[in-house]
Every structure is written in structure tokens, then in C-alpha cells.
């Protein structure tokens, strides 16, 4: 899990994620009413209007999904697209929305574990580490 706000995000890992040849999955999480002008990526920031932030999150999501037009001549301007990214948009970060996110990730862990034939409720790896530690 990592993240950043503003131009630091744009010019570091967002560019790497968009143009990387590596495959990844990711989640974009947007809280539109917890805006702080100190960390805003827009020059004409309006604290009372969260439309710009929502539109920016949607545009990043679509860029990951669709990529750029394949007719672009320069290779370094091409963005591949077809990257599996989910977009979660919330009005505010509070106890309820944080609980929703935790529930989503717990369900995702359980679902993926069932496909890998793993019981996510046992701790054999943890117990093995404890046994090895006792023998050192």
C-alpha cells in the first residue's frame, strides 16, 4: 500500500504505473470531501467543489483501463492500458467508510484464498516461524 497527494504522486509512481511494462493490480481510493488546499493538485482549487478531484480520479482510472491511442507516433508517449484497477469513491473518510474498505479487503483476501486453495484463517506459516525461533 502506498500513496501520495498532489504533484508528488503525479510525477513519481503514477507515471511509473502508467508507463511500466510490469503487470500490476491496484485500487484508486478517493475521498472527495476531505480536501486540504495544501495538498491539492489543482491550481484553481475550490474547497467547496469536489468535482475536480472526482473527475481526476475517474480520468486516472480510465487511463489505466484504456491507455492511449495506439496511433501515437512516439513510443515513449504510448500508455498500454488494460491494467486491472478498481476505483473506490467516497464522500468522506470516517469510521463507516473505513469499515467498508476493511470489509472489501477482507472479502477480497477470502475470495482469492479460496481460488489458491489456502485457508486464510490458519497460521501454519506463523507457527512454523515460532517453532524455528524457539530452536535458535
Residues covered by each model-derived region:
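A SIS-like phosphosugar-recognition module
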Residues: 1-136
Amino acid at each position: 500500500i502506498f500513496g501520495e497527494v498532489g504533484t508528488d504522486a503525479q510525477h513519481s509512481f503514477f507515471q511509473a504505473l502508467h508507463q511500466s511494462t510490469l503487470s500490476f493490480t491496484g485500487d484508486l481510493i478517493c475521498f472527495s470531501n476531505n480536501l486540504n488546499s495544501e495538498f491539492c493538485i489543482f491550481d484553481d482549487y475550490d474547497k467547496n467543489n469536489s468535482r475536480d478531484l472526482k473527475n481526476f480520479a475517474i480520468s486516472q482510472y480510465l487511463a489505466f483501463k484504456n491507455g492511449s491511442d495506439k496511433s501515437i507516433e512516439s513510443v515513449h508517449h504510448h500508455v498500454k492500458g488494460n491494467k486491472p484497477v478498481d476505483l473506490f469513491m467516497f464522500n468522506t473518510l470516517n469510521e463507516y467508510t473505513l469499515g467498508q474498505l476493511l470489509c472489501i479487503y477482507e472479502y477480497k483476501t477470502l475470495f482469492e484464498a479460496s481460488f489458491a486453495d489456502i485457508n486464510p484463517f490458519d497460521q501454519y506459516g506463523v507457527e512454523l516461524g515460532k517453532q524455528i525461533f524457539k530452536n535458535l
